[in-house]
Amino acid sequence: MALTGFRAGRQTRLDYRARRHRVSTAVGDNEVIERIDAFCDAVPRRRARPDEYGPLVIFVPTGSGWPYYARPRRGSRPPVTAADIRAVRARQRELVIPESFEWIEQTAPEMAAAAAEAGLEVQAHPLMMLAGPVHVPPLPPGVTVRIIGPEDPELDRVWAVPAVAFSHPGTRAGEAGAAERDKIAADHDAGTIAMLRERLRSGHSVLAAVFGPDGPLAAGSCQAVDGVAEITGVGVLPTERRRGLGAAVTALLAADARDRGVQTIFLSASDDAVARVYARIGFREIGTAMIAEPAR
């Protein structure tokens, strides 16, 4: 599915064949997975035109912004084959959009093998839902966490935090920090920030960040459709990792979504180590989020 957060958040490639036998579902999980799958189909339709190709659908961008993925059609459909994926890849090349596919493994179990046969690299990520109360982790001294409004003067620097984080993948501490964040913020495209500001005004997205004396240190976002919300793009400056800041952002976004009446709150973890962090907040693994794209 491409869970909309996968692309920003993935950092580690996991063997989808190994994961398939590790995920056990509880009573009611299939219903939750169905709601999440509907969410992943609905979100791209806000800013893209759906074009169906056999059992798959491509979301063709209708304006600026991040290009979307292809995914299995919802409802009754034939199984996805390698030939279907090759046909969609050809169309994606014609449209000059990424040859990317995202789906939930439990809704299209045949698709991983088809994607691999079609020459794509297949990645698997823990799909998790908030299963109880939000456990808010303690913050280190000298930092605060808050929701960011559309007119917040720090909006551009908050936006830049995940850009730095995901250009230095992994969870280990590193040297990139405030200077890199501020450079990206200074060089930002005004249209991108304007689009983000509009999404915050409309309520389509919620943004949160952790702040220290030198500005934003961690950030993430959440978007909701029809009672389902995804937390996505949680990133921490490499200089600030291993301090619980990403967990603080995630917990605030989850609590905020619940306060707004959202019933199903989910996310995807980049790997099992990150999944354990989310588990301490109150998330539980219910399935597997899949990505397939050309090997880099």
Positions of PLM-derived features:
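Conserved beta-hairpin
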Residues: 49-54, 110-121, 204-218
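Conserved acetyl-CoA-binding loop-helix of GNAT-fold acetyltransferases
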Residues: 81-89, 233-238, 242-255, 259, ...
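Conserved GNAT acetyl-CoA-binding A-motif
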Residues: 95-104, 257-270
